C-alpha cells in the first residue's frame, strides 16, 4: 500500500540533501512504480517534487517501471503522456524490445529523457543459463529447435567479430537504439 505522503517525500529529499551536503539532485525518480500505484504517485507524491523543483532542489522529476510487475509497460505508456515526468528509467534489451514502439516514439517527441536498466541480465552473461532458457522455450514450442543447432543460440551476435562477447553485443545493441539517452551498466562482476 502507498503510505508515503507529499510531506514525507519532501522531508526525505531535504534530509538526503543535508546528509549528502548537496544543494540539489539532478534527477529524483520514484522507483519501481506498479501500475496500480501510478495515480497515487502522480497525484499525491509528485506535487512535492514539483515544489522542490521550483525551489531548485530537484532538477528533473522522474519515474521508473517495475518490469516484472508490468511487462507490457502500461504504467510508463501512461506516464510519458502526462506531467510532471521529464525522465524515465525502463528495462530494455535484445530480448525485451517493447519500448521501441510503445515508449521511445513518445519520449523522443516529448523530450523525455530515457535511462535503460536491465540491458544485460543472466541470459546474456551466463552461457549455460542462456542455453537452458532457450531449450525451455523450444520445449514449450515458442522457438524453433534450429536455434539450438549451433551451440550458443545468440552466437551469431559475435560471429562476425563486431562484439567481443554476448554481453558486449547486448550493450552495443542498447546504446544504438533510437530514443535511448543513457545505458546503465550493472554492478555485477561477471
Regions found by a protein language model. Name each.
Residues 1-3, 27-31, 90:
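A short, structured active-site edge motif that brings together acidic residues
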Residues 3-11:
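Glycine-rich anion/phosphate-binding loops
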Residues 12-20, 49, 76:
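Short, charged beta->alpha transition segments
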Residues 12, 28, 169-172:
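Generic alpha-helical secondary-structure signal
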Amino acid at each position: 500500500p502507498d503510505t508515503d505522503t507529499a510531506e514525507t517525500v519532501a522531508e526525505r529529499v531535504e534530509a538526503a540533501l543535508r546528509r549528502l551536503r548537496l544543494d540539489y539532485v539532478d534527477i529524483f525518480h520514484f522507483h519501481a512504480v506498479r501500475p496500480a500505484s501510478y495515480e497515487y504517485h502522480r497525484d499525491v507524491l509528485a506535487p512535492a517534487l514539483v515544489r522542490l523543483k521550483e525551489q531548485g532542489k530537484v532538477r528533473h522529476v522522474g519515474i521508473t517501471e517495475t518490469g516484472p510487475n508490468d511487462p507490457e509497460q502500461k504504467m510508463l505508456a501512461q506516464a510519458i503522456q502526462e506531467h510532471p515526468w521529464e525522465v524515465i528509467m525502463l528495462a530494455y534489451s535484445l530480448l525485451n524490445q517493447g519500448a521501441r514502439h510503445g515508449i521511445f516514439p513518445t519520449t523522443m517527441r516529448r523530450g523525455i529523457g530515457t535511462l535503460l536498466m536491465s540491458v544485460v541480465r543472466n541470459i546474456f552473461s551466463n552461457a549455460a543459463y542462456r542455453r537452458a532458457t532457450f531449450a525451455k522455450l523450444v520445449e514449450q514450442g515458442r522457438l524453433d529447435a534450429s536455434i539450438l543447432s549451433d551451440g550458443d543460440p545468440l552466437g551469431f551476435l559475435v560471429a562476425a567479430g563486431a562484439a567481443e562477447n554476448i554481453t558486449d553485443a547486448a550493450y552495443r545493441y542498447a546504446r544504438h537504439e533510437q530514443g535511448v539517452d543513457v545505458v546503465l551498466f550493472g554492478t555485477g562482476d561477471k
